[in-house]
């Protein structure tokens, strides 16, 4: 099934004119994610190197170099904890498209998942390891992080749009977090508190395929700003059965 899934991913990418590349595994600077890297040493050049934690930076160089649609299916390494959902060595699928937006990429991801399910199982309904069935078919739900958090709290949470439109204050968000018993980081800002509060209400409760979109700018500073909403970026995460894919 794994080989069928990988073949299906490659076919769907090819159908959308994406070019597959292989980027370096050994890197002088680890980046593209917040994770602890494995380190090694290249004797030939007396050089300390890192096993990559993500291919993002090199894939984005491909975009800058003129490859408008690019993807990679390959191994990444993160020297962190191990559990049922995390491994120190794992296969990642990562893709980038120029002249698109988060709507076009969202539609692509939906097709990638549905095509893979069809090619492996012959249906959008897949059989999981515990024997239960899960349906990837039909329309997928989309929710806004700020709108859904406001609904859960019973009050409007406003994005931080800058000095002229500061939105809901860090102090007020902190008070809400303390009241709910939500853990807080040592370094706090509006965006981090919004995400922590949202995760408290929703993260493990989104069973059906759901795109969560419009994140705070503070937690995703390199993402394109929202076209109409100050303080928000055009980013989504996909949740399935309570897990972020």
Predicted regions and their residues:
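A translation/RNA-centric and nucleic-acid-associated enzymatic feature enriched
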Residues: 24-117, 134-135, 139-245
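Flexible helix-coil linker/hinge segments at domain or subdomain boundaries
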Residues: 116-126
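Extended, charge-rich, solvent-exposed interface segments
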Residues: 1-16, 21-30
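Short linear capping/connector segments at secondary-structure termini
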Residues: 128-133
């Amino acid at each position: 099934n794994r080989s069928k899934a990988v073949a299906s991913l490659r076919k769907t990418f090819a159908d959308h004119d994406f070019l597959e590349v292989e980027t370096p595994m050994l890197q002088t600077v680890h980046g593209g994610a917040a994770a602890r890297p494995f380190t090694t040493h290249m004797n030939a050049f007396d050089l300390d190197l890192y096993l990559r934690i993500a291919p993002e930076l090199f894939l984005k160089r491909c975009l800058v170099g003129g490859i408008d649609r690019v993807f990679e299916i390959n191994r990444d390494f993160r020297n962190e904890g191990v559990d049922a959902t995390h491994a120190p060595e794992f296969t990642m699928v990562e893709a980038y498209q120029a002249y698109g937006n988060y709507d076009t990429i969202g539609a692509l991801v939906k097709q990638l998942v549905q095509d893979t399910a069809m090619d492996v199982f012959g249906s959008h309904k897949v059989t999981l390891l515990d024997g239960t069935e899960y349906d990837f078919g039909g329309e997928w739900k989309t929710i806004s992080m700020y709108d859904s958090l406001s609904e859960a709290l019973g009050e409007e949470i406003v994005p931080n749009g800058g000095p002229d439109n500061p939105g809901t204050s860090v102090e007020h968000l902190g008070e809400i977090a303390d009241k709910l018993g939500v853990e807080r980081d040592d370094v706090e800002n509006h965006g981090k508190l919004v995400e922590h509060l949202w995760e408290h209400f929703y993260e493990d409760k989104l069973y059906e395929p759901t795109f969560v979109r419009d994140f705070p700018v503070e937690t995703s500073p390199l993402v394109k700003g929202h076209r109409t909403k100050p303080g928000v970026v055009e980013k989504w995460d996909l949740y399935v059965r309570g897990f972020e894919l």
